[in-house]
Amino acid sequence: EAETFEAELAWLLLNQRCAFNSPVWFNIGVDGVPQQASACFILSVDDDMDSILNWYAEEGRIFKGGSGAGVNLSRIRGSAEPLRGGGASSGPVSFMRGADASAGTIKSGGKTRRAAKMVLLDVDHPDVEQFIWCKALEERKARVLSDAGFDMDLDGADAHSVQYQNANNSIR
């Protein structure tokens, strides 16, 4: 059975009837590299700082392995909601800023490809409007900076000043 599978798989690949995902090409059979073959991981984040910081760390490890990650941030309370120890919550959009910067810094699989990232927020979350507008406002900023002569190309010298650009945001 193994020989038949190998022959059929080789035929499919050589005749371009199928192709492996990026993590397989980057990782499998490469010495010193995590043998991570999944293209995408779904993460969970709870409404506490340990969980949020763990989300950042998990995404970093996933991106390093050449894979992408998706996360629904709806469990994080809205901005201005009260915290146990006093004060108000920052809300999910503020935590997206840190995760976005991390994704922009870590090249997927150590290669030149940027990390693949999806962020979801439920339509009934109190910060849904802020979530919708955060990326649009930053893209407007990028156009203004580009018109003023700043290098806003994808890997341009000044593109790092634009936030929320490393994820596909979606309302659920």
Task: Write out the residue ranges for each language-model feature.
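Extended catalytic cores of very large enzyme megasubunits
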Residues: 1-172
